[in-house]
């Protein structure tokens, strides 16, 4: 039996590994397309080797979900090359609002009156991001374009989450694991044409790519999949919020990159609203006698 303490430490480790993605992406001299392709290629191999459950039961329903995840992986890397890591992760964290808005059409799940407050809070957070302009710096040379790419990654991430829920309704086991493998494999293939040819590939670049594929994605997913079934959903969700919280810290340490006050306020509002909404949903499910 898995130790409760060990399971929680594994989720914390996964969140912290995920959070280093922004800083690591900025460390390579490669293009965003090259980083996205090579990182995902390594991650797909690692996940396939490390997670036996990801090798079984593939079917056509995986494809649209894997495409959405592949787009998320690519867009997130491209966004991190152009805007601050804080902006990239905070804007991607808006995904739950799109899941709510798409729910009536994709999942036949209605938007409840109580969800309106969450939608309004996230909308206000988004408004703070896009009000005014941000100054370009070496680690974030085109914040406006990067913010749009990060926003797009939030939408594709929402499509992936909705797809996983759709797969779950069809009783598919380990859908998340298989999607992680297929999505990374697709991201590798889709970004590869734009990644070639490669010029000036250094030992430092190789180290960054290996770290991203082996640890930031591969080991993080291994920790998460080992632990997630042993930790209550709300507790796991709360611990995984370490990712958007820690990501700006790593880039500040490495590059002295600081998000604007507006972006920081918007990010805190989005994360706080998500946590409150998750807690409220958990309480409502408990009151209804649902797991």
What are these regions (language model features)?
Residues 47, 69, 101, 114-134, ...:
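Hydrophobic transmembrane alpha-helices of multi-pass small-molecule transport proteins
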Residues 28, 35, 79, 105-107, ...:
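Hydrophobic/aromatic residues within transmembrane alpha-helices
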Residues 4-7, 29-37, 55-59, 131-156, ...:
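Juxtamembrane helix-entry segments on the extracytoplasmic side of multipass membrane proteins
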Residues 9, 88-94, 164-186, 217-253:
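Helix-helix packing/entry segments at the starts of transmembrane helices
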Residues 17-22, 53-92, 100, 124, ...:
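Specific transmembrane alpha-helical segments of multi-pass solute transporters/efflux pumps
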Residues 1-37, 67, 75, 124, ...:
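Glycine-/small-residue-enriched transmembrane alpha-helix faces in small-molecule transporters
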Residues 15, 47, 99-100, 136-198, ...:
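Transmembrane alpha-helical segments that form core, pore/gating elements
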Residues 34-37, 41-45, 77-110, 114-116, ...:
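Specific alpha-helical transmembrane segments that line the substrate/conduction pathway
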């Amino acid at each position: 039996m898995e130790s409760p303490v060990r399971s929680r430490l594994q989720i914390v480790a996964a969140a912290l590994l995920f959070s280093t993605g922004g800083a690591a992406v900025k460390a390579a001299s490669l293009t965003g397309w090259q980083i996205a392709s090579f990182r995902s290629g390594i991650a797909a191999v690692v996940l396939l080797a490390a997670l036996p459950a990801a090798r079984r039961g593939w079917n056509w329903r995986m494809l649209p979900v894997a495409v959405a995840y592949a787009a998320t992986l690519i867009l997130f890397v491209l966004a991190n090359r152009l805007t601050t890591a804080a902006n990239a992760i905070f804007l991607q964290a808006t995904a739950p609002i799109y899941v709510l808005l798409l729910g009536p059409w994709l999942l036949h799940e209605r938007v409840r009156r109580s969800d309106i407050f969450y939608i309004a809070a996230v909308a206000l957070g988004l408004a703070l991001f896009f009000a005014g302009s941000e100054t370009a710096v070496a680690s974030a040379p085109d914040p406006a374009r990067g913010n749009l790419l990060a926003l797009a990654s939030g939408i594709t991430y929402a499509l992936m989450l909705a797809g996983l829920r759709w797969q779950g309704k069809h009783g598919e086991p380990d859908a998340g694991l298989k999607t992680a493998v297929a999505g990374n494999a697709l991201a590798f293939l889709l970004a590869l044409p734009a990644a070639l040819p490669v010029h000036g590939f250094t030992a430092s670049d190789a180290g960054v790519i290996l770290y991203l594929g082996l640890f930031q994605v591969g080991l993080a997913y291994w920790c998460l999949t080992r632990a997630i079934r042993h930790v209550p959903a709300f507790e796991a969700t709360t611990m995984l919020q370490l990712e958007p919280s820690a990501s700006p810290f790593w880039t500040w340490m490495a590059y002295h990159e600081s998000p604007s006050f507006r972006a920081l306020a918007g990010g805190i509002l989005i994360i706080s609203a998500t946590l409150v909404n998750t807690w409220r949903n958990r309480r409502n499910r408990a009151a209804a006698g649902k797991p």
